[in-house]
Design a protein with these regions (language model features):
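Extended, subdomain-level signal for the structured scaffold at the beginning of enzyme domains
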Residues: 1-94, 98, 107-113, 128-173
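Catalytic nucleophile serine of serine hydrolases
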Residues: 102
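Short Cys/His-rich Zn2+-coordinating modules
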Residues: 116
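Acidic, metal/cofactor-coordinating or nucleic-acid-engaging core segments within structured domains
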Residues: 119
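Glycine/proline-rich loop-helix segments at beta-alpha junctions forming the active-site rim
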Residues: 122-124
Length: 173
């Protein structure tokens, strides 16, 4: 089955946006790894914690079929990380599935991979500005797919986001 990398902020990732798609992907037999900016415990907004399998700078996109940026109030930090932006750009250059949920699409926009693409995001003044600066066309949908890119607007869309990722991984193989 496919290998998937989920990237979370060290602090204040959105719990459901990690655990719901992760569980769905694993149930389908996909190998899911977690990365964060450091190999140290990451904590969610609702109190869950996870020990990342690797730091983002250790992640090689060649080993993964999909890269997912998890949202939450801490996720804008990921959009400021050269390691995260480089990972997204490298995954895109290798024609991988690139996905993000909630505020996670800010990292995709800052990496320059959403130019000319339709996308959705957790709507704030700042997030819409970053999407626009990245050349994305905001849809306002719960989940938006444009080619290999999947974006979702927040925790209530985590199930649909997971289902869409599973569909796309099946099509890839």
């Amino acid at each position: 089955m496919s290998k998937v990398l989920m990237v979370v902020a060290q602090k204040n990732f959105r719990d459901e946006e990690l655990f719901i798609p992760k569980e769905m992907l694993q149930t389908e037999g996909h190998d899911v790894k977690i990365a964060s900016l450091a190999r140290a415990k990451a904590t969610g907004m609702l109190g869950a914690s996870v020990m990342p399998d690797m730091a983002v700078h250790e992640a090689n996109p060649d080993f993964f079929d999909a890269i997912i940026i998890v949202g939450g109030s801490g996720s804008p930090v990921l959009a400021e990380s050269e390691d995260v932006l480089g990972l997204v750009q490298n995954a895109n250059a290798r024609n991988k599935i690139v996905a993000a949920i909630c505020l996670g699409p800010m990292a995709l926009a800052r990496a320059g991979v959403l130019a000319g693409k339709k996308a959705t995001i957790f709507k704030t003044e700042e997030s819409l500005k970053v999407l626009k600066q990245g050349g994305a066309k905001y849809t306002g949908e719960d989940v938006t797919v444009d080619g290999r890119f999947v974006t979702a607007c927040g925790p209530h869309a985590a199930n649909d986001f997971g289902r869409k990722l599973i569909e796309m991984l099946k099509e890839q193989h």
